[in-house]
Amino acid sequence: MLLKNIKISNDYNIFMIIASRKPSLKDIYKIIKVSKFDEPADLIIEDASYIDIYTKRISSGNIAIASGRIAYIGDEMPLKNNDTRIIKNDFLIAPGYIEGHAHPFQIYNPVTFNEIMIRHGTSMVISDDLPIYIKMGLKNIKRFMRFMGRLPVKNFWSVRLDSQSMIDMEKFSYIKIKELLNDDYVLQAGEITGWPYIINMEKNMLKNIYNSQFLGKRIETHNPGASKNTLNRMAAAGITSDHEAITGEDVKTRLSLGYHVFLRYSSIRKDLKDELKYIIDEKLPLNRLMLTNDGSPYYNDYMGMDDLIKIAISTGLNPFDAYSMASLNPAVYYNIDGIYGGIAPGRLADMNFIRDLYNPEPVFLMLDGKIIDKEVKLDPPDWKGYGMLYKNRNIDINKINFNGSDETLFMRNQVIMDLNKYKMEDSMEIHLITKDLKRIVSSNIHGMGQFDALASSYNIEGSYIVIGSSHDLMKKALKEVIKNGGIVFNGNKNIRIELKILGIMSDKHSDDVRNITEEFRSTMRGSGYKFDDPVYSMLFLNSINLPYYRITSSGIVEVKTRKIIKKPVSLKI
């Protein structure tokens, strides 16, 4: 490989000049002049072999780049001078991958999540805004979106229209959501977890959906196990995509109703291979299918978009179709294929240099026409300046009483909970303290294992949850979590996961996050946790978009009916 005048950079500050990726008129003039061979290119990849995602073949030619965009592809040699950087190599070039459905706040934070994405060749991410919007407010989240827009990965957002919990719905008023939807960094509304609001024609939800359509934004729903009638009604309301197909038949139903479908492969959902086999056997069209990885920290490091492409190819999918599902298809879905999703003139110069068609893992990346190290470490923002640091709180923990309960929340899997009316053997106590520290909900839980204490501020509501068998250690762990945020585990091993950012995210780099969450996972499983991913289990304990029962700030709730089975009790702290 020859890289002339090329510096492989691990400094993302080189990208600050192209924060919005909107070319100036001067840039457009330059790009056209380079394409006409009237002006030298900034960079030329000579004799490149690249994946032509549009015609589904490997093509070759010289690629000229100017102002961060591809200006020319073809057999002729573009104009160059002493300042033109030259790349000659034997790698195959693939388009930058797109993660179209991301949750960048699962212990890692959005910046460290970007580090992980780069490692796997993903150069554009469309992320859920839910927890940071609820905790930061409108002004700060808009500022934070602009900071994220200055990172090498292109960061866009999907704006939630409901809270996914029994609280905070007042924050999703039409006026507030309208301002967010108008932002240039927002491409979509959703995911919509509160789909009954649509079916029941709740006014605020329908106004937000109407405005999303008016602004040309996509609208994504969350409908696992939904009937065809429900999916019909959601599509009639304007829904454009869903990520919760569980079987190949689910995929077919969604496609038949006009949906775009995200095919998911994550630590809690490994349906992708079976879905793809069905899709191939049924000869379903592929142009409305996209790949997504929705995993927890330890999982994301091992299963990125490059791995999903590899899985798709190994299942029997045409390799070019697999790459399209990770690049062109999501670009078309989000109406950005004029600037992204493939290697062609006018597109941003985001590319992965890979060894061959069957190995999508990047050896190195090009982002905005600049070669960078795929192990790049990104500088964090001023978390305090964005209002994102957890605010320390002190309480008299002895004023909290853990009263016993008869019923048991038992875990069918790592995210689905049912309810028994009696206390089950091998269950432990679980208590939720509301984030205002004014109420407590108490029950038992089965499936988490057996240990002394586990306290956490890491959940959808931002409330405080403590589980265990030792009241003294439970109070000690809870006091620490209320004071500093994070996860505290006391059992056969003591673990402390600091979550200094809003009480749900670590300020550590991605490697550190992976190591501590792997240790937590291993320790939980060694303590009898029955499933694979305790991080997800903790996150979703009070999330009302999952069956069948949840422990929430409003009490123990039957999800389907929203009926309060057990009410909270007042605290006097």
Curated annotation (Swiss-Prot):
Record keyword Cell cycle present: no
Enzyme class: hydrolase
Pfam families named among the record's database cross-references: Adenine_deam_C, Amidohydro_1
UniProt keyword annotation of Secreted present: no
Catalysed transformations (reactions): adenine + H2O + H(+) = hypoxanthine + NH4(+)
EC number: 3.5.4.2
Keywords for the protein's UniProt record, in alphabetical order: Hydrolase
Domain of life (superkingdom): Archaea
Similarity-based family: Belongs to the metallo-dependent hydrolases superfamily. Adenine deaminase family.
Protein name listed in UniProt: Putative adenine deaminase PTO1085
Gene source species: Picrophilus torridus (strain ATCC 700027 / DSM 9790 / JCM 10055 / NBRC 100828 / KAW 2/3)
